[in-house]
């Protein structure tokens, strides 16, 4: 019975990975076509970077998980876990700072506040956002340098061989340090989401005072952006829970189902958010509908040939 359950978990994880690669690949392809036509916008650049980093992150999650499931001795007898940790940090941080840039973009484009600094930033969104992306990238690189030092110190402490049976407290502390940058970026996204909610609440109060009774375009934009941001926050919390479950597997190595459940939960974030972005972006949604229509036409042609 245990093997059947393991097979189901592996099937689900592989399916999530395939959907994630397809969804993020579609986002990247649509924006790359716009880039070839010299039509790539700021949000297109952010979505492309987010899609590429998510695909990279999916491969790292799957590679790490399958090694732990099928060949855990590889980690104990080599430095592979060190390289996987480096790649995971790169994928995780780049994905997070692109997602944070997207949150800031929605906030500057849609929110309404009378603060002078906010109005100045809002009027120069297309100029400010590239600097913001560079700032997030630099902070990510600085954090990565600190993470590299942590990993290197731990490697030297264990005589160049990673000890997978370390004390629980030491391992959890190391994981918290590795995720400091991600927590910082997530906090920024959470702040922008809260500010968007405040902006929507104020806007609704103004609309009620005008007694229009109708939802204007600004309200629709607020709601659409909030759906994307709130879904991102929920999915990232699931991702973090999945990571915590996978980390706890290092202390309970006999229970592989724990690892598989953690992988399944972790993989929801990179593939689920990609489809939410497609549905929430009019250009991506229209492109996906055209692809589906073409697939239906191809299916009808095949059926006609068979008959």
Curated annotation (Swiss-Prot):
Keywords from the UniProt entry: G-protein coupled receptor, Glycoprotein, Membrane, Receptor, Sensory transduction, Taste, Transducer, Transmembrane, Transmembrane helix
Q: What residues are glycosylation sites in this protein?
A: 158
Q: Which residues lie on this side of the membrane: Extracellular?
A: 1-6, 64-100, 148-179, 249-257
Named from the GO MF annotations, one term is:
G protein-coupled receptor activity
- Its principal location? membrane
Q: What Pfam families does the record tag this protein with?
A: TAS2R (PF05296)
Q: Which residue ranges are assigned to the Cytoplasmic compartment in the record's topology?
A: 28-42, 122-126, 201-227, 279-307
Q: Which domain of life is it from?
A: Eukaryota
Gene3D superfamilies linked to this entry: Rhodopsin 7-helix transmembrane proteins
The membrane-spanning stretches of this chain are 7-27, 43-63, 101-121, 127-147, 180-200, 228-248, 258-278
What more the UniProt record tells us is: Most taste cells may be activated by a limited number of bitter compounds; individual taste cells can discriminate among bitter stimuli.
Q: What does this protein do?
A: Receptor that may play a role in the perception of bitterness and is gustducin-linked. May play a role in sensing the chemical composition of the gastrointestinal content. The activity of this receptor may stimulate alpha gustducin, mediate PLC-beta-2 activation and lead to the gating of TRPM5.
Q: Which family does it belong to?
A: Belongs to the G-protein coupled receptor T2R family.
Could you identify this protein by its name?
Answer: Taste receptor type 2 member 10
Source organism per entry reads Pan troglodytes (Chimpanzee)
């Amino acid at each position: 019975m245990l093997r059947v359950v393991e097979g189901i978990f592996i099937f689900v994880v592989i399916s999530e990975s395939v959907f994630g690669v397809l969804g993020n690949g579609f986002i990247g392809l649509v924006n790359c076509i716009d880039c070839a036509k010299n039509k790539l916008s700021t949000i297109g650049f952010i979505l492309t970077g987010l899609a590429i980093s998510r695909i990279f992150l999916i491969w790292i999650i799957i590679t790490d998980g399958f090694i732990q499931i099928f060949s855990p001795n590889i980690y104990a007898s080599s430095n592979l876990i060190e390289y996987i940790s480096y790649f995971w940090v790169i994928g995780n941080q780049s994905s997070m700072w692109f997602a944070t840039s997207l949150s800031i973009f929605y906030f500057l484009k849609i929110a309404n506040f009378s603060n002078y600094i906010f109005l100045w930033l809002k009027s120069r969104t297309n100029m400010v956002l590239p600097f913001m992306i560079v700032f997030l990238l630099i902070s990510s690189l600085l954090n990565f340098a600190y993470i590299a030092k942590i990993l290197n110190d731990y490697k030297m402490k264990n005589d160049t061989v990673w000890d997978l049976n370390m004390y629980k407290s030491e391992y959890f502390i190391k994981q918290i340090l590795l995720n400091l940058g991600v927590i910082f970026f997530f906090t920024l996204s959470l702040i922008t989401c809260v500010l968007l909610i405040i902006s929507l609440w104020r806007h609704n109060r103004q609309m009620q005072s005008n007694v229009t009774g109708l939802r204007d375009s600004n309200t629709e934009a607020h709601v659409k952006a909030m759906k994307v941001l709130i879904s991102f926050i929920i999915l990232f919390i699931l991702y973090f829970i999945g990571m915590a479950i996978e980390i706890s597997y290092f202390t309970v190595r006999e229970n592989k189902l724990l690892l598989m459940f953690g992988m399944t939960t972790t993989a929801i974030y990179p593939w689920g958010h990609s489809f939410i972005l497609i549905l929430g972006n009019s250009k991506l949604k229209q492109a996906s509908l055209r692809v589906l229509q073409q697939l239906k036409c191809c299916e009808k042609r095949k059926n006609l040939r068979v008959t």
